[in-house]
Amino acid sequence: MDFTQVPPSYILGVLLSSTSILFCLKYLLRSGYRPPELPSGPTTVPLFGNELQVPKADAHFQFTKWAKQYGGMFSLKRYMNTTIVITDRKLMKSLLDKKSNIYSHRPASLVSHLITQSDHLLVMQYGEEWRMLRKIIHQYFMEPNCEREHWKVQEAEAKQMLHDFLTMPEDHMLHPKRYSNSITNSLVFGIRTATVHDEYMDELFYLMDKWSLVQELGATPPVDSFGLLRILPQWMLGNWKNRAVEVGDLMQALYSKVLDQVRARRQRGVYRDSFMDRVLDNLEKTPLTENQLRFLGGVLMEGGSDTSSSLILTIIQAMTKYPEVQAKAHAQIDAVVGSERSPSWSDFAQLPYINMIIKESHRWRPVSPLGVPHAVAEDDRVNNTLIPKGSTIVLNVWGMHHDPDRWSEPEHFQPDRFADYPALASTYAASGEWDKRDHYGYGAGRRICPGIHLAERNLFIGVAKLLWAFEFSEPLGSRSDISAESGASQGFLHCPKDYGCAIRLRAPEKRETIMREFEEAQGVFSRFD
C-alpha cells in the first residue's frame, strides 16, 4: 500500500480513533483498581472494584463487618470512585472536626441535583451559599432562642400529643409524627399541624419515604463514578432518573404550596415571628432565589419532622420490650413530678434518666446509620495512607454505636450506659476531645445538624411527658419486631415499622391533668389560627 497516497484526513481519523480507544482502555483498566497507597479494603475486581459487593440496602451491616476485618478506616473502589468508610471515633474527630475546611463537602451527585437543583442544604456543596443559608438557620434556632421562645410551642404540642395518645391510642404510630411536624411547621412557617390527617404532614412523610430510598448508599446506579451508565436506557437500571425526578416534583409541589400560604397570609396583613417571615422580611438584605426559599423551608420541615418522631417511636417500642427500663423511668418521674402537672423542660436536670433513654435510642437505632456522605476537597494523608481529592467519606454511625469494645452487649437497650453523660448532645459534640462524644446521631463536623438544640428539647419534652402519663406494653398475643435487620424501614433514614402497642394511663387523676393542659395549650395554638 502506498501510504503517500493516503489522504491526511484519513490518517488523522485513524490517529484520533486510536487515541480514543487507548484512552478508553486506560480508563477501563483504572476503573475499580485500588492503588497501594489507599487504605486497605476488600478485594476488588477489574472495572467494578467493590461495587458488586456493596449491598443495595442496609450497607451499614456489611461495612461494620469490613471494619472489624480492615480497621476503623478502610477503602472501597466503586468504578472510578474512592469511598473511605470511617468507624474509628478518633479518626472521625481528627478529620471531620479538626480538618473540617476540607472534609465538609458533598460528593458530586447527579441524582441529588435532579431532585433539588443543588439548592438543598443537606446535599449542597460546601461554600459561600452553604455558609449563608446555614447562618440564616442558626440565627433562628440557636440555643438561646430555644431556651427563650421555642420551648413554649414544644410544650404545647407535647400536651396535645398526650391528649391524642389518650383519646386515639389506635393512631400511636402517627401522634409522634404530628407532634414533631407541628413544632417544625409552627416555628418555620407559622402553620400548625393540628391533626394526624393534615395534608402537609401526609405529603411530607410520603415524599420522605421515597427520598430516603433514592438517597440510600448503593440504591442508585453509580452514574457519578462511571459516567457511561448515564447513556444506558434508564429502564435497564431501575428507572433511577424517573425516581429522582418524581421525588423532586413532590418536594417542589409541597414546598411551593407552604411558601405560597405564608405569602398569602402576609398579603392579608397577618405577620408572625416565624422563621420564614423573618427570611422574607430580610430579602433585600439577604436576597434568595425562589428555589432557595422553597428548599430552605423544606430542609427544615424534613429534618425537624422525621428524626424526632422516629426516635420517639423507637423509644416507645423499646419500652414494650424492656419493662425494667420503663419502670425506672416511671420511678424517677414520680419522684420529681406529681399528678397535678406533666413534666416540662424545666425538669431536665432532675430527670437524668430520660436523657439517658434518649441517648441510648440514638445509639441503639440511629435514624441515619451511615449519615450523609461527605467528600474531601483535596488530597490528604492519614497514617501513611492517601485519601484522594474527591473521595466519598462515609460515617459508619452504626458501627461506632454498636462497637462491642466500647458498648457491652450493644444489641440491647441499656440507658445506664450514659450515666456519665448528663448534658445535652450539643455539649459533647462541641468538645475538643474525641472520647467525650456521646453519640453521632446528629452527624459531625461543620455539617452537624443545625437543629440539634431544638431536636434535643423535642425529644426530652415529648418522652418525659409520655412516660409520665402512660405505660406501654405489647398487646396480648402480639410481638413487635425490634430486630435491627428487619424491624425498621429501609433507606438512608430509618424508622420503626408499624408495631402494635397497648397504652395504659398510669393513674386515673392524670386524665384530668392531660385534658386541662390540653385546654391550656390552646392559648399557644391561637397564635397560629
UniProtKB/Swiss-Prot annotation:
Its main location: endoplasmic reticulum. This is Cytochrome P450 monooxygenase patI. It holds the Pfam family p450. Keywords: Endoplasmic reticulum, Glycoprotein, Heme, Iron, Membrane, Metal-binding, Monooxygenase, Oxidoreductase, Transmembrane, Transmembrane helix. Glycans are attached at residues 81, 383. It is found in: Endoplasmic reticulum membrane. It is an enzyme of class 1 (oxidoreductase). The keyword Oxidoreductase applies. PANTHER family: CYTOCHROME P450 MONOOXYGENASE ALNH-RELATED, P450, PUTATIVE (EUROFUNG)-RELATED-RELATED. It catalyses: 3-hydroxybenzyl alcohol + reduced [NADPH--hemoprotein reductase] + O2 = gentisyl alcohol + oxidized [NADPH--hemoprotein reductase] + H2O + H(+). It comes from the Eukaryota. One of its GO terms (molecular function) is oxidoreductase activity, acting on paired donors, with incorporation or reduction of molecular oxygen. Its EC number is 1.-.-.-. Cytochrome P450 monooxygenase; part of the gene cluster that mediates the biosynthesis of patulin, an acetate-derived tetraketide mycotoxin produced by several fungal species that shows antimicrobial properties against several bacteria. PatI catalyzes the conversion of m-hydroxybenzyl alcohol into gentisyl alcohol. The pathway begins with the synthesis of 6-methylsalicylic acid by the polyketide synthase (PKS) patK via condensation of acetate and malonate units. Belongs to the cytochrome P450 family. Residues 1-8 are cytoplasmic. Heme binds at residue 449. One of its GO terms (biological process) is patulin biosynthetic process. Its cofactor is heme. SUPFAM superfamilies: Cytochrome P450. It is a single-pass membrane protein. GO terms for cellular component: endoplasmic reticulum; endoplasmic reticulum membrane. The chain crosses the membrane at residues 9-25. Pathway: Mycotoxin biosynthesis; patulin biosynthesis.
